[in-house]
């Protein structure tokens, strides 16, 4: 009797360890009745063999949206079906035998006599084997890109802005995704002309570049982007949201802002649109992000067809549209393929407190220029300050920066790089053949030179100003550039030019006695296009071409601080 009770307890332990997947009735001993027999319907279990019909419940690639097919490897959407059934080791039976002190099933059956036979001690396969969840089946283009960073050259698809907008219904709700690092160059002008402001929600991604935590994001960063979008396109400030798809910042605020029904996510390629949707979908379903949402990649135009994602409550639907590309490919026309990933890695600014001035974020030493020397930023941009200018510059983009004795020397290194400078450039060797010459209109203080799809470079002239010449910029013709009054003046608290009693301070006393404030966007222009100029015009004549004056010395005396400078020669039409 005692031995039978021991066996009953052992059966109960085995049953509990197997998570209730088999009942005590299987063993037939006196433990019968101690556990409720589980309800099991073998017809509901998933088959281990995966058929093509079950895999193609959704005929589109869940990563890029293209229609899947298995017959033509050289055509678009080709995918490989997974191989056959996988063998599963019977760990539960092994555990049961160990708990019974290695007593074989036949011996155990003899001890229990007529109450049980050896076959009843074998656990049916369906009881311990979990149904296999099909893996995401993706096309070979996505698979190779995400796992091996390989580019399929046979698939080159450009998505102009108007082509993407044509897929959006006229009464739709639109989420316009913009990147903070090249803001506002990704702004769709045609979108604003086609749809009402009430239909558009603006989402600023990659905001974590400026802030170490999401608290600073909302406290000091939101006002700048709200003011800018109101000024440029008449946006509703209540429908401007700052997020970080990588860190899951601002997702709750975004979901509470979006109206019910379908919301079409629109943005330039590689603005973080698909990453944002993956974060939202993954958070909603409480699963890993890799199991939900669209695929992400450093390749341009990775999403190729509209993809719909319904949230759990079924009242909100996210539609991921393909990213629209810059005319003629933009920066990707000139980039080497092995450097596609580099331009997405933006340097993180060191966290600033309210007691630190934004100028402290310029670590480079000032350099004196002679009017001929140039700074080359990865071969994408060449900066030539005028003679006598002392310039501090800091590149927030992950690109190599080199100084050359002249523009001719810099381009010759790009076209035929020596072994020591083979990594000085991220562009193709023929990119200098399409250089266009620009000038920055007169400015005062810290500015950002913004490169579309890449990031920005901070420029700060120090010392006496050159009032007769302008800073010249050279870049390949299809790379879009602009200048903005430095974003750091507005997303961080800075020192004002007056103290707590509103007395105007001398420059040297601003840091010590200036009142700490968060600046709002002024009425003056804070964005401007670069002015293209002929390549053969002497540098000393460029100021006259832009301003109509040959010297700004008298005008310069009127303003003591950069915040007072009116930027009267700036042109904001690039953003309108």
Swiss-Prot record:
Keywords: Mitochondrion, Transit peptide. Pfam families: MMR_HSR1. May be involved in the mitochondrial lipid metabolism. InterPro entries: G_CP_dom, GTP-bd, Mito_lipid_metab_GTPase, P-loop_NTPase. Residues 162-327 form the CP-type G domain. This is Genetic interactor of prohibitins 3, mitochondrial. Its main location: mitochondrion. Residues 1-49 form a transit peptide. It is found in: Mitochondrion. It comes from the Eukaryota. Transmembrane segments: none annotated. GO terms for cellular component: mitochondrion. One of its GO terms (molecular function) is GTP binding. Belongs to the TRAFAC class YlqF/YawG GTPase family. GEP3 subfamily. PROSITE patterns: G_CP. It comes from Komagataella phaffii (strain GS115 / ATCC 20864).
């Amino acid at each position: 009797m005692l031995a039978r009770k021991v066996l009953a307890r052992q059966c109960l332990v085995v049953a509990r360890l197997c998570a209730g997947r088999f009942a005590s009735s299987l063993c037939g001993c006196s433990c019968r009745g101690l556990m409720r027999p589980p309800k099991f319907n073998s017809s509901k279990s998933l088959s281990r063999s995966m058929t093509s019909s079950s895999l193609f419940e959704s005929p589109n690639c869940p990563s890029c949206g293209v229609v899947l097919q298995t017959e033509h490897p050289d055509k678009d959407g080709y995918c490989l079906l997974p191989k056959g059934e996988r063998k599963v080791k019977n760990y539960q039976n092994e555990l049961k035998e160990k708990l019974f002190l290695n007593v074989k099933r036949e011996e155990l059956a003899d001890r229990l006599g007529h109450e049980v036979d050896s076959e009843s001690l074998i656990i049916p396969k369906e009881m311990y084997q979990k149904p296999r969840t099909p893996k995401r089946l993706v096309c070979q283009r996505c698979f190779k890109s995400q796992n091996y960073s390989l580019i399929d050259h046979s698939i080159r698809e450009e998505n102009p802005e108007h082509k993407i907008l044509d897929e959006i219904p006229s009464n739709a709700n639109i989420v316009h995704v913009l990147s903070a690092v090249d803001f506002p160059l990704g702004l769709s002008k045609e979108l604003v002309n086609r749809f009402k402001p009430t239909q558009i929600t603006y989402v600023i991604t990659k905001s974590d570049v400026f802030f170490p935590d999401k608290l600073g994001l909302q406290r000091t960063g939101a006002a700048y982007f709200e003011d800018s979008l109101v000024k440029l396109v008449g946006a509703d400030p209540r429908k401007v949201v700052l997020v970080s798809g990588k860190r899951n910042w601002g997702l709750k605020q975004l979901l509470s802002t979006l109206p019910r029904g379908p919301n079409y996510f629109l943005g330039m390629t590689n603005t973080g649109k698909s990453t944002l949707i993956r974060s939202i979908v993954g958070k909603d379903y409480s699963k890993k992000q890799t199991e939900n949402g669209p695929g992400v990649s450093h390749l341009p135009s990775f999403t190729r067809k509209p993809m719909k994602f319904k949230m759990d409550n079924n009242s909100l639907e996210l539609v991921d549209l393909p990213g629209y590309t810059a005319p003629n490919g933009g920066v990707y026309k000139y980039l080497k393929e092995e450097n596609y990933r580099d331009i997405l890695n933006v340097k993180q600014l060191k966290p600033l407190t309210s007691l630190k001035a934004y100028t402290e974020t310029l670590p480079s030493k000032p350099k004196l220029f002679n009017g001929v020397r140039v700074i080359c930023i990865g071969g994408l941009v060449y900066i030539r300050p005028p003679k006598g200018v002392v310039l501090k510059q800091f590149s927030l983009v992950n690109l190599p920066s080199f100084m050359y004795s002249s523009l001719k020397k810099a381009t010759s290194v790009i076209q035929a790089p020596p072994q020591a400078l083979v990594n000085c450039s991220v562009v193709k060797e023929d990119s200098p053949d399409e250089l266009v010459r620009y000038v920055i209109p007169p400015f005062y203080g810290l500015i950002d030179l913004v490169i579309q799809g890449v990031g920005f470079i901070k420029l700060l002239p120090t010392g006496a100003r050159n009032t007769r010449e302008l800073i010249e910029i050279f870049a390949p013709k299809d790379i879009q550039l602009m200048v903005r009054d430095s974003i750091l003046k507005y997303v961080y608290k800075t020192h004002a030019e007056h103290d707590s009693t509103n007395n105007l301070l001398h420059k040297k006393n601003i840091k010590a006695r200036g009142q700490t404030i968060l600046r709002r966007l002024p009425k003056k222009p804070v964005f401007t296009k670069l002015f293209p100029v002929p390549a053969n015009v002497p540098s000393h004549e460029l100021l006259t071409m832009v301003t109509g004056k040959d010297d700004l010395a008298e005008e310069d005396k009127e303003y003591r601080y950069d915040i007072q400078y009116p930027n009267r020669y700036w042109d904001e039409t690039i953003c309108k």
